[in-house]
Amino acid sequence: MPILEVNNLRKIYTTRLGANRVEALKNVSFSVEEGEYVAVMGESGSGKTTLLNILAALDKPTSGEVKLGARNIAEVKEADITRFRRENLGFVFQDFNLLDTFNIRDNIFLPLVLSGKGFAEMQRRLVPIAKKLNITDILNKYPYEVSGGQMQRAAVARAVITNPQLILADEPTGALDSKAADNLLELFSALNNEGQTILMVTHSVKAASHAKRVLFIKDGAVFHQIYRANMSGEQLYQKISDTLTLLIAGGEENA
């Protein structure tokens, strides 16, 4: 059953005086099944960021619809959208988005605090997550006292502690060194193997090769997609690289 459905999504940006129109997304349609791990790739300016912002309910499409768990996001009232986002989506960003004035524990607790959860409930959820992510000994430290890899694991903990239907990750390995990036990608795979649905936007072929499906966006439209099926990580890496070469060279859409 699809946990996310994107139907004929269009986004047009118009300049202030209406002289120029830029179509950032052109009738984009796809779905993400519960438990899938999907990577979205494309060149800068292809529409990936616009798509992610709409999926995150941070922007609205010009036309088309996005359904999360069968609910049309556009029908969520403006007053309820923040709560809807907090209860259904988990976010992992390139720059971590941790608050320097909060220790790691309080950063992770933040979405639960905003949802009105009590300390006992928050602690009950945190203990197994912190153990799994290997961050138990840094919970009392502040973001500026830990490494980039530790900050990103804390951000992942914050994303999963609400039990979201879907994790949206935006270039999650972009600010990490190769070892920390590898650790994060292994963590994402482990979370996915436990049933967590993940959609990740990335420029990294290595990151995308950990996913079970890769969507390619070009000029605001879905250009191609690859399913991992029985491919090894190395085989998927090569197929992604070949597709990106075709995309950059201007190959046929849906080739």
Q: What kind of feature is each model-predicted range?
A:
Residues M41-E43:
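The feature captures the beta-strand-to-loop junction immediately N-terminal to the Walker
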Residues A56:
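Helix-to-loop junction immediately C-terminal to a conserved catalytic motif
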Residues Y142-V146, Q150-Q152:
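Conserved ABC ATPase signature
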Residues I167-D170:
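Catalytic Walker B motif of ABC-type/P-loop ATPase nucleotide-binding domains
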Residues I161-Q165:
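A short, proline-enriched helix->beta-strand linker immediately N-terminal to the Walker B motif
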Residues G64-N72:
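Conserved ABC transporter NBD signature motif
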Residues F102-L110:
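Short coil-to-helix segment of the ABC ATPase nucleotide-binding domain corresponding to the Q-loop/switch region
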